[in-house]
Amino acid sequence: MVVLGIETSCDDTSIAVYDSEKGIPSNVVTSQLIHAQFGGVYPEIAAREHTKNFLPVLDKALRDASITLSDIDAIATTFMPGLIVSLVAGVSGAKTLSFSLKKPLIPVHHIEAHIFANFITKEIEYPFLALVVSGGHTELILVKEFEDYIYLGGTLDDAVGEVYDKVARALGLGFPGGPLIDKLAKEGKEAIKFPRPLLNDEENKYNFSFSGLKSAVIREINKGIYKKEDITKSFQNAVVDVLVKKTVLACKEFGINRVVVAGGVSANSQLREEFLNIKDLEVHFPPMHLCTDNGAMVAYTGYKRFKEKGISVSLDFEAKARCRIDKFPQLLRSFHA
């Protein structure tokens, strides 16, 4: 089965092909560098760029896979969550292809796709704890099976990747901030003991909060006392400490020794090192090229949904800016084609 995967939930236009016999023969990602000058993503600009990039990216994805549209068996696309104007750009393109080619339209949840990007290169046993860390999300999810999810907690304010971007902007490092801070932190030491938000809060043991940490870091930046590399190291130590300890706590309480880390921040070298150093914990990370938003994870997850659940949806199914992953399977059934 050959599935076309479309991802436009934020500022990356990505289209990929998943072939059940060949794997991922193509995965084209066009990043919108125009946002770097603003230090963040502007939705209206993102939507315009998606519309401009869609056909060239589609053409390259097909050429890289050495196929034509007639070889496609189904169209998978990210329907939710994300920037609504960005999502609509991809969903509109997917619906047009589905209608004109008379092929099934398979909906994919953005968080779900990040999690199952880990499955593209290896099989992972259920159940497992998923830690999703990206520019828009910080969530802990118990995955019992595909489409059987228990949402444990998420961020109460800023997502971890968003805070990385804002701290990087305050330091004058550029955008996106995650890789830049990760690189600079390797040269620094922990000169400041920043707060570990909600780390010992029983009522919020699976929730996250990074706005206070962000403010504390920016205050220290504005004082101009410490070196940039020491600030980034101190900041990253606090972030990684919170992410790892809350995940390990959930593993202990649910009796699970398997963790899947997903999302753009899963590329962080210190986060990987801290998790992989934990004894008796099986931790999985996606390949580096599948950490950030990409069409391959959408194509594969769409294939998995169609193969295991037989799910496709009618053209009436609409994109949504918000939808928790545990609510998504039930929502699908009301629009099952």
UniProtKB/Swiss-Prot annotation:
Its localization reads: Cytoplasm
Name the domain of life: Bacteria
Principal localisation: cytoplasm
Q: Which residues bind Fe cation?
A: H110, H114, D293
Keywords for the protein's UniProt record, in alphabetical order: Acyltransferase, Cytoplasm, Iron, Metal-binding, Transferase, tRNA processing
List all disulphide bridges recorded for this chain: none
Provide the cofactor list for this protein. Fe(2+)
- One GO CC annotation: cytoplasm
Gene3D superfamilies in the record, alphabetically? 3.30.420.40
- Cofactor binding comment, as recorded: Binds 1 Fe(2+) ion per subunit.
Please name the GO terms of the biological process aspect recorded for this protein, alphabetically. Answer: tRNA threonylcarbamoyladenosine modification
Q: Which PROSITE patterns match?
A: GLYCOPROTEASE
EC number(s) stated in the UniProt entry for this protein: 2.3.1.234
Q: State the Gene Ontology terms under molecular function.
A: iron ion binding; N(6)-L-threonylcarbamoyladenine synthase activity
Q: Which residues bind substrate?
A: V132, V133, S134, G135, G136, D165, G178, D182, N268
One Pfam annotation reads TsaD
Reaction equation(s) it catalyzes: L-threonylcarbamoyladenylate + adenosine(37) in tRNA = N(6)-L-threonylcarbamoyladenosine(37) in tRNA + AMP + H(+)
Recorded family membership: Belongs to the KAE1 / TsaD family.
What biological function has been recorded for the protein in this entry? Answer: Required for the formation of a threonylcarbamoyl group on adenosine at position 37 (t(6)A37) in tRNAs that read codons beginning with adenine. Is involved in the transfer of the threonylcarbamoyl moiety of threonylcarbamoyl-AMP (TC-AMP) to the N6 group of A37, together with TsaE and TsaB. TsaD likely plays a direct catalytic role in this reaction.
How is this protein named in the record?
tRNA N6-adenosine threonylcarbamoyltransferase
Native source species = Sulfurihydrogenibium sp. (strain YO3AOP1)
